[in-house]
Amino acid sequence: MQCVAQVLWKSDVAKIGSWSDSLGVMPTMTSISSLESLTDRVIGGERITPKEALELYHLPLEELGALANHRRMLARTDAVDGKGNEIVTYIIDRNINYTNICNVYCKFCAFYRTEKEADSYVITLEEMDQKLDELTAVGGIQVLLQGGHHPKLGIDWYLDLLSHMREKYPHVNIHGFSPPEFNHFAEVFKMPLEEVIRRFKEAGLGSIPGGGGEILVDSVRNRIAPLKANSDQWLKVMEIAHGLGLNSSATMMFGHVETVEDRIEHLGRLRRQQDETGGFTAFICWTFQPENTKLRAEPVGSAEYLRMQALSRVFLDNFTNVQSSWVTQGPKIGQVALRYGANDFGSVMMEENVVSKAGANFRLESQEIENLIREAGYTPRRRNNWYELVD
């Protein structure tokens, strides 16, 4: 007798075909899992506890992937007029880093510079216009705007930048400024956090990325980024932003000094926040990229990435969208991830400066993304930040 997860996996194999088999990531069938009652509850759509998540983490990868794929289907059943499980979405945007000057010196970051370094910079309006002209020329509709914690830029610099972008490029959503940046702004501007976020929104900010989350466990954060916003501060920014009508994404960067239990605690904090505010549009996880950083850690492989993405999809039962991280894993693993809980292929990513400095250098055009999605058995569709179809 086979457990239900194995039966689901057999069905997935038939749908996937040979495209992932050639990558060596589709394992052989395993013996009956001792966690059948738990997996049956997962299939039934029940919420799992952190302890149960740890048990599921140790399932054979193909069984966990089958459960994640099933939970993806449950989450997407009513999306896009009932066609949510027939499509995979993506967006055309550009990641623009307005400055690389930063005074928090995260050990996992290869991007930051001090003010005195020759290659430090602060973007000009002319440079921003050039980048946005290039973005709109290829059909781009969003800019991911983030930067270092610059110790001297005042609020007027940011508000002028946002106002300029909104007035000149009104159809481009500004998906900008991570929670640690907002925490930094409140300190530098000497203003209440809510006032800062409100003024940024009034100037043109449309949504907030989930960057800077890393692992929302302070014992971990104190080791990898002791000068950065702590876990409660990160979540507070999101709580305020959601209350002001700004949606955001949520992220996890793993594979450094944290434990599996830390990862699950991180997911638990995101789930509780989503229960309270409902403001997260999607979850994205990726693995630590160690090249050129001060943090020494053995890189985790693609199997571990797929395992954590699958577990995240099962655990985060109140998130509709999970994004594949092809930027760090490569196009083929990004494709396989579509059967491990992901329903979105992320962004064409015209420009990316942070993880590329740490060793991830994958690039894709929109046609390549669409081909990968079709090969996986889905229909590609373009979306905006709110997961509304735009094609």
Language-model segments: which ranges?
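Conserved short loop/turn motifs at secondary-structure junctions
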Residues: 53-57, 94-95, 147-151, 254-257, ...
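Helix C-cap/helix->beta junction micro-motif
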Residues: 71, 75, 168-172, 244, ...
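Hydrophobic faces of well-ordered beta-strands that scaffold small-molecule active sites
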Residues: 88-94, 143, 174-177, 208-210, ...
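N-terminal pre-triad scaffold of radical SAM enzymes
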Residues: 65-116, 120-146
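Conserved, mostly hydrophobic/aromatic
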Residues: 45, 68, 106, 145, ...
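Conserved Radical SAM active-site core
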Residues: 25, 113-251, 256-265, 269-272
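Glycine-rich, proline-tolerant flexible connector loops at the mouths of alpha/beta enzymes
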Residues: 94, 146-155, 218, 291-292, ...
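Auxiliary Fe-S-binding modules of radical SAM enzymes
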Residues: 2-62, 130, 136, 267, ...
